[in-house]
A protein has these predicted regions:
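Conserved, well-structured interaction surfaces
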Residues: 93-166, 197, 212-218, 373-380, ...
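Aromatic-residue-lined binding/catalytic grooves and analogous aromatic/hydrophobic interfacial grooves
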Residues: 35-36, 231-270, 531-547
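Hydrophobic-face positions in mid-chain alpha helices that act as interaction patches
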Residues: 251-386, 419-460, 480, 486, ...
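Inward-facing hydrophobic residues that define packing positions of alpha-helical scaffold repeats
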Residues: 121-124, 203, 210, 254, ...
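Membrane-proximal, proline-rich intrinsically disordered regions
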Residues: 34-83, 321-322, 326, 495-548
Length: 548
């Protein structure tokens, strides 16, 4: 079988990224990236898939090299506007923060993520199509593992596209909600498939691929954490079924991921407290492939490391001290005054107000060392055990297993915070019922850690046990996933309203500018203009901005 592509630059770019990532692991940010040998193996316009090794190389490039984290994080309630006097922004960031249709293109733009994911899907499809002709070259078990990885790559890319470019999945509305094209053949072109299937159809295809892949996927890779392994696949299944509102399956796959001793699988926050307390050291450790908590690591052309690092870059929209002290990391929490093992870092100066965890590294690959030009890079965990644990807690709450959910919440809390407190359903309910809801003031701009929840599934009345425990889950998961974009999907799933406001020079909310309500059309990122030009139906948009 032959790969034919009119965009060979994407193949070369992806090959360079993988080679760079492996060099990063081996040389610990030496930046002396040696990828010429790998690139020499790439063709100028076509590649014959005639061996199992060809398929393995294909699948290395079936993971997205662009990310949606930056767009998702800045569309969420994890950032505030620091005013028109702050010059550290761009038209792209302005569009993202205010939920406008994004016309600008860069490595983190929806257009690049869309194109990259569909390229990954085409690659996975080509691998699947090639395997049947290679049965005489290897064992059945190796072919099965390759098939499992290809199916997972195809399912994952579609899942990420659907969650960014569509409304949140609900079994009550999915049949009538626009999805994205599910590509099952390597030669397909999106322009040939302008009609968007329902979101229900897309999720059914994702589930089909996921269920077929789960018993097949293996761990026989040179660097396993950069590929789907069984644990990473279970974490994917857990998140998928959580978003599908299939709570028993979400809990089941989380348990398979975490094993019999979840505490041993979580991030080593206590060890990080003993490390050199620099951004470089801590962020490199955060994405360490030897950590049990990191299940699938992906490389990306991305500015996430500099945007959420100790820099002024794009600081007009920021997770600043007001958000941290009232809604997220530094706010009054159920554990009281107990400190984090590895806390946040605050930077405050003219046009700079950031409170951040040191997570994703800021890496730079020089294309021209003399001119000082090149690419922003980062490495990030697409799935972690810590997220899986909190996902299981949510599923257990929805199943009415409140004691087990409280046990999971305790595990997460005691791992990140220096406390011996053991949470119970009653302690959780009492704490969250003692907090006012966010935006309860006359101007609708002041913050607390508790927001009104408006999901389509039943969570009981406000103040009841189920609602209070979900407040705890969402509170903990918001801290856990800060700076990774995942909070945006909780906002969509739970119909959480977001108020856009301007923070004044005193660091307090002053001016209301916009509000995003449940099912606002802007919750679905607009289909990229190239796809719309080819005939793909755009997402609807509101006719006016609503006042609170």
């Amino acid at each position: 079988m032959i790969i034919k592509t009119t965009d060979i630059g994407r193949w070369i770019k992806k090959g360079r990224m993988i080679a760079w990532a492996l060099s990063f692991i081996a040389y610990h940010l030496s930046f002396s990236v040696a990828c010429d040998d790998y690139l020499d193996e790439l063709p100028d316009n076509r590649m014959e898939v005639t061996s199992v090794e060809n398929v393995k190389k294909l699948l290395v490039t079936a993971y997205p090299g662009n990310e949606s984290m930056l767009v998702a994080e800045f569309m969420s309630d994890n950032v505030d506007d620091y005013g028109s006097d702050n010059p550290n922004t761009s038209r792209f960031m302005d569009q993202v923060y205010y939920w406008r249709d994004i016309t600008e293109t860069n490595n983190s733009s929806p257009e690049n993520f869309w194109e990259d994911c569909y390229q990954c899907i085409a690659t996975a499809n080509l691998a699947l199509e090639s395997l049947d002709g290679l049965k005489d070259q290897t064992t059945d078990s190796e072919l099965a593992e390759l098939r499992g990885e290809a199916l997972l790559c195809r399912a994952y890319a579609h899942f990420m596209l659907a969650n960014l470019f569509c409304q949140a999945y609900s079994p009550l509305t999915a049949a009538a909600t626009k999805g994205i094209v599910y590509m099952e053949h390597s030669a397909e072109e999106l322009s040939y498939n302008p009609d968007r299937p329902s979101l229900a159809d897309v999720y059914a295809h994702i589930e089909r691929d996921l269920l077929e892949a789960l018993p097949l996927v293996g761990s026989n890779y040179s660097v396993a954490k950069y590929h789907f392994t069984p644990r990473a696949a279970y974490a994917f299944a857990c998140r998928f079924y959580l978003y599908c509102e299939q709570w028993e399956k979400a809990a089941q796959y989380a348990s398979l991921c975490l094993g019999a001793s979840p505490e041993t699988m979580l991030r080593d926050w206590s060890y990080m407290a003993t490390m050199t307390q620099t951004f470089a050291a801590l962020s490199q450790h955060y994405i360490d492939a030897t950590l049990n908590s990191n299940l699938l690591l992906l490389t990306a052309y991305s500015a996430m490391g500099i945007v959420f690092g100790p820099y002024r870059y794009m600081s007009k929209y920021s997770h600043g001290q007001y958000l941290a002290r009232h809604e997220t990391s530094e706010a009054p929490h159920i554990w009281g005054s107990a400190p984090y093992y590895q806390g946040t870092h605050t930077y405050s100066a003219t046009n700079l107000d950031k409170t951040i965890f040191f997570k994703l590294p800021y890496l730079f690959e020089y294309a021209d060392p003399v001119a000082g030009t090149g690419y922003y890079r980062t490495v990030y965990p697409a799935f972690t055990t810590d997220e899986a644990l909190l996902n299981r807690a949510e599923a257990r709450v929805m199943l009415g297993d409140y004691d087990e959910a409280a046990a999971d919440l305790t595990r997460w809390m005691q791992n990140i915070v220096q406390t011996s407190l053991v949470l119970t359903p009653q302690i959780i309910q009492d704490f969250y019922n003692g907090i006012d809801y966010c935006y309860s003031d006359d101007k609708h701009i002041l913050s607390t850690v508790k927001k009104h929840l408006n999901p389509r599934f039943n969570i009981g009345e406000e103040g009841e046990l189920k609602e209070a425990m979900l407040q705890c889950v969402l509170d903990f998961r918001r801290i856990e996933t800060l700076q990774t974009g995942l909070r945006w999907y909780d906002v969509k799933r739970y119909g959480i309203e977001i108020v856009r406001r301007v923070i004044n020079a005193a660091g307090e909310p002053e001016t209301f500018t916009d509000i995003l309500r449940r099912d606002d059309p802007r919750c679905a990122v607009q289909i990229p203009i190239k796809a719309r030009t080819a005939g793909v139906e755009p997402n609807p948009r509101p006719t006016s901005i609503e006042n609170p």
